[in-house]
Amino acid sequence: MRVFTLAPLALLPLVLARPSQRSSSPQKPIMADNGDLVMIPEGHEKSNLDEIIASSELLSLHRSLSEIESISNNEGSVGDFLVEYLERHGFTVQKQAVPLDGHEVDEEERKPSRFNVYAYPASSPSPEIILTSHIDTVPPYIPYSLSLPPTASTGSSSIDRRAIHISGRGTVDAKASVACQIIATLSHLESNPDTPLGLLFVVSEETGGQGMHHFSNSPLNTSPPTFHTVIFGEPTESKLVSGHKGMLHFDVHVRGKPAHSGYPWLGRSAVSEILPILSKVDSLGDIPESEGGLPSSEKYGKTTLNIGVMEGGVATNVVPASASARVAVRLAGGTVTHAKETILAAVRSASKNPEDVHVSFSAGGAYPPVDLDSDVEGFDVMTVNYGTDVPNWDIHDHDLPDHGKVKRYLYGPGSIFVAHGENEGLSVGDMEDAVEGYARLIRAAVGRSERK
């Protein structure tokens, strides 16, 4: 294992550039002022913001990751960067080829176009604690940029460096988690080199979780588990997540009979048939379960539905011969089977011509609410409504007693509210706080290792 000297975790937030040796330069050096305040000469804001990022191992790693476009199916370049970075810092790295979404594995291809990255210190080939996140992003690519909110200025020549805002696609979801997990791991290993830590960075989380499914079905997912803790990274506002809603997708297809719109009684309108069905479906989260609605729970609230896509008809002067809709369900309780039965019953009750209506559920990706561990002190705790890769990793601990089951934590910097938007971004302070949060989770997991 190569020796790597990393600034102690406590020093990571404030690794500032050294003063320039060129006394003739009109630009004053960046200087620490009262902890997180930094002197910025007027007119040099951009260059000095860049310098602050470059002077921090955490922030420069995050910038390098975010500057590489890695929209789902195009994660190869960011994977190559991670492999080189982790090997340079003493990790043994395995690349796990993952076929592109909708494609088969090309066995003849020597270099996979994309791959999961699985890494561990040479001294610990069987990690007991694994930190994981994803390296793909949603489209479109938005370049990395830095800005200084007006509230960050504390005077004519100083700013609060923690308030520096970092923007761009993936800066939050989830390259912030990736960078913070790596730095927290390196910092822990610097003083505890024998800790059995591992890192797993997967592709395709945003498009169905093929990367995590691929890892889950591989020999690396040991049975029974050789690991006892998994720390998942997603934007959680640096709060510990005690669980998230389940997920179910389905399509409604309606067949009609075309006719001239001047004589609609000669046909059957598929649109007129699907509208009351969708109205009924859309209300299932607000109907009590005892009256045919979908379940709610104290922990997750109501089940919610989103009719995301509707299609029907070909022209205004033609009675529509077909109509369809695609619906996403965020389950707050119950089982997937029960939810499907409830949806089918609602569709039947709202159909005038049930024989013309067909409901199809997505073959994969359906799961009930996911409960997670939140037993580490020092965190605010919340639930979230979005889906993650957690259910895509089938951990083989189902037959183990409760005290032997794998702990699963979900934590990370940034907010889901901006994660897929044009305003995706977070602050330097968010990043630095998350490194300490991951470090705290690692320390708690190490305590379990020592009690084994």
Swiss-Prot record:
Cofactor: Zn(2+)
GO BP term, example: proteolysis
GO molecular-function term, one example from the UniProt record: peptidase activity
Localization of this protein: Secreted
Top EC category: hydrolase
Signal peptide positions on this chain: 1-17
Alphabetical keyword list: Hydrolase, Metal-binding, Protease, Secreted, Signal, Zinc
Entry GO terms, CC: extracellular region
Domain of life: Eukaryota
Catalytic residues (UniProt): 205
Transmembrane segments: none
Enzyme nomenclature, EC number: 3.4.17.-
Family membership noted in the UniProt record: Belongs to the peptidase M20A family.
Protein name listed in UniProt: Probable carboxypeptidase CPSG_08841
